[in-house]
Amino acid sequence: MKILVLASRIPFPLEKGDKLRLYHQLRHLAPNHDITLCCLADKPIDEDQTHALSSLVTALHVLPVSGPRRWWRMMGAWLSPLPFQVTWFTDGKAQVALHTLLKEVEPDVVFCQLVRGAEYIKDFHEVPKVLDYMDALSAGMHRRSHMAHGFLGPLKRWAMRTEGNRLARYEARVFEYFDRHVIISRNDRLLIPHRDRDTVDIVPNGVDLQAFGPTNSPAEADMPTLLFTGNMAYEPNVDAAEHLVKDILPLVQTRPVRVVLAGAEPKQRVLDLASAEVEVTGWVDDIATEYHRATLFVAPLRLGTGLQNKVLEAMCSEVPCVLSPHAFSPLGMPSEGHAVVCGDPQSFATAIDQLLSDPSQQHHMAQQAKAQIQKNFSWESHVAGLEQILKDAAQ
């Protein structure tokens, strides 16, 4: 099958959730299909990206999105009904280039990741199209609007509510232009504002079972280590990091204890959290090493949508997890025996202290969670489901 894939970013390196999801989907689709990958980018692809992706696809095309034209479009974005992020990623010259490629390649099906790329292909009717919503972006934006504070808080809340409303209308409208639709979790599907949302197929993320399996020689920790990972420029992760350090850590009775915030592109707000008890790593070449030296994984996420790769990775690495309902619910498994789910700072602190004092409970919970992840969250099984959806659309 000839598949043309449209991505709003080059899916490497894997420091963002959309990149990680698409990279592993390509990795498992590649052996059996002819894939043309088209990526939007505002700078040339580098050697590492080319090396990582060229072995996965038959052809790799980078569609330049001009910086000056992008900012010119944004000046008029307030007058457009399109979501701001759709305007940001939609470039006229890139669209012409993509349509030329579509006519040259003649794919059996087009796979578009995220609604921000939908304008490029929604009116191209010569080929079946599949849209990966990935997350319910409109719901995520509305949640973030409630957490905007400070001097610019009112302006930020208004802008986020506006974007959330535009995204909701767009998620509903663009539904009609695609033959099939997929999304990351049942929770997110419930938030898609369309009468036929139940027809959206669930394609969860997976986890690399070998890369994140438990190690036979875990790093020796000089003190209990609480780990939180993720792209530290992404607002839901920034908020969770601040919540962990400012609201939860002071209530933890166990001392000494260390918090590690591991992830790329830390904002200044995250860097400012560093202290004698808090380590901010920045980019980590192999994030699995951070799981292997952690005692507990703590994810007090309050914002965002979708299934969290970080939770899958922690559980697969046999790290006991203390999670917010927001982080745990998309897994679709019972919390009993798999994680401790907490809704407020004191319950987080109490759970952390209890687990740190009970290695037997840590081990039992880690084993139970790992078994569930190995059973239900392999990339192979989930990409097989996506492959069948693409085949059905192409017929």
What is the predicted function of each stretch?
Residues 1-62:
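N-terminal subdomain of nucleotide-sugar transferases
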Residues 47-49, 119-121, 165-199, 268, ...:
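A short, active-site helix/loop in glycosyltransferases that binds the activated sugar's phosphate group
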Residues 67, 71-84, 130-169:
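Acceptor-binding helix/loop patch of EC 2.4 sugar-transfer enzymes
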Residues 167, 172, 194, 198-293:
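Conserved catalytic-core segment of nucleotide-activated headgroup transferases in glycan assembly
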Residues 310-313, 320-324:
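Short hydrophobic beta-strand element within catalytic cores of glycosyltransferases
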Residues 339-346, 354-359:
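Conserved acidic donor-binding segment of nucleotide-sugar-dependent glycosyltransferases
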Residues 361-376, 382-385:
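A short, well-ordered alpha-helix in the C-terminal region of glycosyltransferases
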